[in-house]
């Protein structure tokens, strides 16, 4: 019975690093997805298209730089809004790149928006893509205010030869170290009891 408890303890300690690794990646996704939400203001006055996007930037990030490109073809407006962020207490290099791109189609009474957002985390080599299709909003005095929401979310790990497998290697090392520590402890306890 005592040996069974020790075996369960060893297995529990062996699985902990792997669970900690996977939960940290999940926390990254759930916290940083909020970077893609905000309000998109579209205004067309005197044949001039103005697009303004106010992103939600959490307190843990510092803003570095921003780009905005707008192209128009007939009643379609294509835009890309990118911004670079760094962790407040991290290095001076950008740690996140967020790119919001979309297609806005308008007529006299409404506008239809297709939006996609890419979050690229340079520290963990992970990317998140959020997409939204055919959201329709009313035009008020040639202004369309859209509240950005998404239909689908895709997470994936980037393939980077320089850092490929570094987090997996760390999790495996923690697994081996914790298994060795628990095994040595069990053998010492068995030796003391006999």
UniProtKB/Swiss-Prot annotation:
Membrane topology, Cytoplasmic segments: 187-194
Positions in the Extracellular compartment: 23-165
InterPro entries xref list: Orthopox_A43R
First and last residue of the signal peptide: 1-22
Inducing stimuli: Expressed in the late phase of the viral replicative cycle.
UniProt key word Membrane: yes
Keyword DNA-binding: no
List of glycosylated residues: 65, 114
Membrane topology: Single-pass type I membrane protein
Pfam families the UniProt entry points to: Orthopox_A43R
Keywords: Glycoprotein, Host membrane, Late protein, Membrane, Signal, Transmembrane, Transmembrane helix
Transmembrane segment boundaries: 166-186
Disulfide-bond pairs as recorded: none
Family: Belongs to the orthopoxvirus OPG172 protein family.
Identification of the protein by name: Protein A43
Organism lineage string: Viruses, Varidnaviria, Bamfordvirae, Nucleocytoviricota, Pokkesviricetes
């Amino acid at each position: 019975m005592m040996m069974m408890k020790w075996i369960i303890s060893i297995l529990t300690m062996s699985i902990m690093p792997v669970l900690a690794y996977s939960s940290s990646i999940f926390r990254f996704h759930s916290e940083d997805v909020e970077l893609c939400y905000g309000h998109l203001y579209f205004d067309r006055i005197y044949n001039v298209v103005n697009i303004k996007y106010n992103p939600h930037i959490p307190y843990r990030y510092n803003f570095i730089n921003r780009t905005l490109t707008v192209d128009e073809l007939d009643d379609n407006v294509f835009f890309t809004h990118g911004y670079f962020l760094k962790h407040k207490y991290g290095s001076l290099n950008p740690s996140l790149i967020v790119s919001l791109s979309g297609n806005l189609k308008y007529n006299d009474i409404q506008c239809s928006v297709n939006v996609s957002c890419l979050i690229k985390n340079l520290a963990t080599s992970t990317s998140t893509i959020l997409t939204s299709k055919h959201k329709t909003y009313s035009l008020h005095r040639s202004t369309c205010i859209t509240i950005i929401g998404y239909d689908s979310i895709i997470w994936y790990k980037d393939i980077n030869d320089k850092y490929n497998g570094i987090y997996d290697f760390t999790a495996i090392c923690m697994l081996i170290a914790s298994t060795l520590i628990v095994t040595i402890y069990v053998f010492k306890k068995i030796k003391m009891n006999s």
